[in-house]
Design a protein with these regions (language model features):
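Surface-exposed, low-hydrophobicity segments enriched in Gly/Pro/acidic/Ser residues
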Residues: 1-209
Length: 209
């Protein structure tokens, strides 16, 4: 579930839903149409909470923070056109003073960051052959209507990158930005030494180009 507008800090989000698995229907929470007298106002309904009024990072694994989307990034535009769309991931290498499309050490030395993040697995004809370009696949790598890039991995610049680096402590401490996913925005913004990854490219959309 994703929302088009952010909830206020004191607002709560909860859902009830049903799904089918192996031909059997399962229900989570209660629906107002279930017909039970217990569900009629002013009685309470049982729902699955996705966001509490005190939603915040919790490194001990409690609460709902771990359910937050940690692989979707906004381009700041809508109605993105796939024609001549280009997107790259770069890393600001302070030792050479330039933006690079790869890291120059570890198991992924020289490997384009698009491939590291599984955003380049196909060629222009959708054959399974990386071609150095972003795979523009609606619903899998991009929501063109609302300008959202979808990384097909969780915590791309955190735990995923750490795994690609072989979980080498020296390399993960140098390159990984785990605080981007398990800290507040204010804390993450203060870690300028880790905030070195950028999405660059060009595109045409309703609000930007």
């Amino acid at each position: 579930i994703s929302l088009k507008s952010a909830l206020n800090q004191d607002e709560v989000l909860a859902v009830a839903y049903e799904y089918t698995y192996n031909g059997k229907v399962y229900q989570v929470g209660e629906f107002s149409t279930d017909g039970s007298e217990e569900l009629r106002a002013p009685n309470a309904m049982a729902l699955k909470m996705l966001k509490s009024s005190a939603n915040a990072p919790d490194k001990k694994g409690r609460g709902t923070w771990d359910l937050m989307m940690k692989n979707i990034y906004s381009l700041g535009a809508t109605s993105i056109n796939s024609d001549k769309f280009e997107l790259y991931i770069t890393y600001r290498n302070d030792s050479v003073g330039t933006e690079m499309q790869y890291l120059n050490e570890g198991p992924i030395n020289g490997k384009q960051l698009l491939r590291v993040m599984n955003l380049d697995r196909l060629d222009m004809k959708n054959n399974a052959s990386p071609d150095g370009r972003f795979d523009f696949v609606e619903g899998l790598t991009i929501y063109a209507s609302n300008g959202k890039i979808i990384f097909p991995v969780l915590e791309p610049f955190g735990s995923h990158l750490a795994a690609q680096l072989g979980n080498d402590t020296r390399l993960t401490n140098k390159y990984c930005f785990q605080e981007l996913y398990d800290s507040t925005l204010i804390v993450a913004q203060e870690l300028s030494e880790k905030n070195k990854f950028h999405l660059t490219g060009k595109y045409k959309g309703t609000n930007s180009s």
